[in-house]
């Protein structure tokens, strides 16, 4: 039943997007919350999609030299550690890509299984 509803919803959205004069194809859009999830269901279909809300970078730090992961103190000021920089880079995901910034259908496809 849910699969039938999803197919009907997908067809309705596709018809709206392809309707002459439709502005929905206009380009990148901000998609947040349930709108983002609905868009992923539409784009990915039966394949589903991948979402990992939080990744731990500690296992990645094992591949780096010991002093790369430690805090650096120069002139009495604490600088951002390498680990903090890694966490900021790894946490970038679909929310940052499609909610904070506009994204395209091709960006969404990167999160399909």
From Swiss-Prot:
Disulfide bonds join 32-99, 44-112, 98-103. It is found in: Secreted. InterPro entries: Insulin, Insulin-like, Insulin-like_sf, Insulin_CS, Insulin_family. It holds the Pfam family Insulin. PROSITE patterns: INSULIN. GO terms for molecular function: hormone activity. This is Insulin. It comes from Oreochromis niloticus (Nile tilapia).
């Amino acid at each position: 039943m849910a699969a039938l509803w999803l197919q009907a919803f997908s067809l309705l959205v596709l018809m709206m997007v392809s309707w002459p004069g439709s502005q929905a194809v206009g380009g990148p859009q901000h998609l947040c919350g349930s709108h983002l999830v609905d868009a992923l269901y539409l784009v990915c279909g039966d394949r589903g999609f991948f979402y990992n809300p939080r990744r731990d970078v500690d296992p990645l730090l094992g591949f780096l030299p010991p002093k790369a992961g430690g805090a650096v103190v120069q002139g009495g000021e604490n600088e951002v550690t390498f680990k903090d920089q890694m966490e900021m880079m790894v946490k970038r995901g679909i929310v940052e890509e499609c909610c904070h910034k506009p994204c395209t259908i091709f960006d969404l496809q990167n999160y399909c299984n």
